[in-house]
Amino acid sequence: RLTKLLRTLRKRCPVARDAEITLEANPDSACDVKALRALRRAGFNRISLGVQSADDGLLRAIGRIHTFAQVQEAVAAVRKAGFKNLSMDLIYGLPGQTMQQWEDTIAAVIALAPEHISCYGLKLEPGTPLYDRRDSERFPDDDAQADMYLYAVTVLAQNGYEQYEISNFAKPGFASRHNLKYWHMEEYAGFGPGAHSDFGGVRYAYVRDLDSYISGRLILSESESDATLTRDYEYVMLSLRTAEGIDRR
């Protein structure tokens, strides 16, 4: 289905020959070398794995079904399939997480040599099981989370990962192109239920309901035109996230 979807997009939309085409996957679903090779032949050239932690106990605590052994297996499969651009997502501030567990996770992920690493502070989203359990869990306090973040910044830099945005680190030449489009406030188009776009001076999002989306009619759940003040404010806020900062001109 993914290969068919990509072929359809290529037919309908102009796609640059050197486009970065990322597939996001859970580690437990990215261990099939044959399937990964088919995806690479179809045009996918970057894999992003939702690793989150190298500690199996923490993974269970946040409801993840993969283990770190499966992460290692997935990395081996991704490399065997020929992918040269691999990203991994990590989360700090997990319930019960210690500094030692975070240090071990950073070390374990560096040992797998991905080209890109994202480190996100835990965000409790309403409607999720972890949000519902928030009062019964013990989370690292703000100071502990700050220490975890600064540790990642320091150690990743020591291992050749350049920080180009608050949460993102990459080997030279491997900064995520689609991430940079957001931070630089460039246009992007989203497809699918709930997808957001910022295109032609208008921002819009499709409805989340699948049946409504596939009805074939253009249904927007929200839309707003550009406002100079809003754009200026967002430029400042987004630029402050990047290593480049604000252009004072």
Task: Give residue ranges: language-model regions.
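C-terminal scaffold of the Radical SAM
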Residues: R1-R249
